[in-house]
Curated annotation (Swiss-Prot):
One of its GO terms (molecular function) is serine-type endopeptidase inhibitor activity. The keyword Zinc does not apply. It comes from Gorilla gorilla gorilla. This is WAP four-disulfide core domain protein 5. Disulfide bonds join C34-C62, C41-C66, C49-C61, C55-C70, C81-C109, C88-C113, C96-C108, C102-C117. InterPro entries: Elafin-like_sf (IPR036645), WAP_dom (IPR008197), WAP_four-disulfide_core (IPR050514). The gene is WFDC5. GO terms for cellular component: extracellular space. Residues 1-24 form the signal peptide. Residues 27-74, 75-121 form the WAP domain. Putative acid-stable proteinase inhibitor. GO terms for biological process: antibacterial humoral response; innate immune response. It is found in: Secreted.
Length: 123
């Protein structure tokens, strides 16, 4: 009986430790995503955080202009953006800034010429 209890406890601990990975997040990582980082790079500014747990409430630790800081998180839709194999010859033009700018299941994805709304990649 003791052996079975220890095996059950071990299995529960193993499964519990994998839950953040199952949901695509590291332990301590808050849900949601980071807003786009379009700012100029300010190399002399030190990081204000290293991980989400250092940020208050619903803020996430995100890169902003080449350093990390606590910013309001944005909602992220399911699926990943498709790969873009093109090279842009015109100036960048952003048609969206975050997933909630896009209708239905479409995601705001980086493309060769900026961000635009696209259907998530399959697979």
């Amino acid at each position: 009986m003791r052996t079975q209890s220890l095996l059950l406890l071990g299995a529960l601990l193993a499964v519990g430790s994998q839950l953040p990975a199952v949901f695509g997040r590291k332990k301590g990582e808050k849900s949601g995503g980071c807003p786009p980082d379009d700012g100029p790079c300010l190399l002399s500014v030190p990081d204000q955080c290293v991980e989400d747990s250092q940020c208050p409430l619903t803020r996430k630790c995100c890169y902003r202009a080449c350093f990390r800081q606590c910013v309001p998180r944005v909602s992220v839709k399911l699926g990943s953006c498709p790969e873009d194999q093109l090279h842009c010859l015109s100036p960048m033009n952003h048609l969206c800034h975050k997933d909630s700018d896009c209708s239905g299941k479409k995601r705001c994805c980086h493309s060769a010429c900026g961000r635009d709304c696209r259907d998530p990649a399959r697979g």
